[in-house]
């Protein structure tokens, strides 16, 4: 029988709550640090900020709060969920708070994380939170409906790690082969 699912914990050791907001903070300090935030994508014609970035250091501003939306129940390791920046916004921009993985970017040869997604739909972008062996978590992107256009989806569950590429001097979240982003979740 499968082991009981393990709840994902925040920086205070509390179980993540779907009704609460969290900052995604990186484990690294200094230049290796930096919270995740919602920002404007270069060259985007979207009417709202539509890029998922992280600040260049942990002394930078605080990140944009997110909420994690599981398909049902609580927030557990290795479970499909949607991610949404939990901020007040005008009606036009509501969908531009919901994370999704963009189309293949020819320059970066990977897919960048952006917003403009949907929640709980077949075509939504689903993520998983997986525990690192010692401390902290990684985010994975796990497409659930074909066609699986996902160059780095390699593991048993057909998921790809979320890491960072440098786009116009900013750190943009993207699917990566190596060096995934090691993160913690800090309740807001």
Curated annotation (Swiss-Prot):
The keyword Glycosyltransferase does not apply. The record marks 111-112 as: Reactive bond for chymotrypsin. The keyword Disulfide bond applies. Keywords: Allergen, Aspartic protease inhibitor, Disulfide bond, Glycoprotein, Protease inhibitor, Serine protease inhibitor, Vacuole. Disulfide bonds join 48-93, 142-159, 150-153. InterPro entries: Kunitz_inhibitor_STI-like_sf, Prot_inh_Kunz-lg. SMART domains: STI. Pfam families: Kunitz_legume. GO terms for molecular function: aspartic-type endopeptidase inhibitor activity; serine-type endopeptidase inhibitor activity. Glycans are attached at residue 19. One of its GO terms (cellular component) is vacuole. Transmembrane segments: none annotated. Its main location: other. The record marks 67-68 as: Reactive bond for trypsin. It is found in: Vacuole. PROSITE patterns: SOYBEAN_KUNITZ. Belongs to the protease inhibitor I3 (leguminous Kunitz-type inhibitor) family. Inhibitor of cathepsin D (aspartic protease) and trypsin (serine protease). May protect the plant by inhibiting proteases of invading organisms. This is Aspartic protease inhibitor 11. It comes from Solanum tuberosum (Potato).
């Amino acid at each position: 029988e499968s082991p009981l699912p393990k709840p994902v914990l925040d920086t205070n050791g509390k179980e993540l709550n779907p009704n609460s907001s969290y900052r995604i903070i990186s484990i690294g300090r200094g230049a290796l640090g930096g919270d995740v935030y919602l920002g404007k994508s270069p060259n985007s014609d979207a009417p709202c900020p539509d890029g998922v970035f992280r600040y260049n250091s942990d002394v930078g501003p605080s990140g944009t709060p997110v909420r994690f939306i599981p398909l049902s129940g609580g927030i557990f390791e290795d479970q499909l969920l949607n991610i949404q920046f939990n901020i007040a916004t005008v009606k036009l921009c509501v969908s531009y708070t919901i994370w999704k993985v963009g189309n293949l970017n020819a320059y970066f040869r990977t897919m960048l994380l952006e917003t403009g997604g949907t929640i709980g739909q077949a075509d939504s972008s689903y993520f998983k939170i997986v525990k690192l062996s010692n401390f902290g978590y990684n985010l994975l992107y796990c497409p659930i409906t074909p066609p699986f256009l996902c160059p780095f989806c390699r593991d048993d569950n057909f998921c790809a790690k979320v890491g960072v590429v440098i786009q116009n001097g900013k750190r943009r979240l993207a699917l990566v082969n190596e060096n995934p982003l090691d993160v913690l979740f800090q309740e807001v």
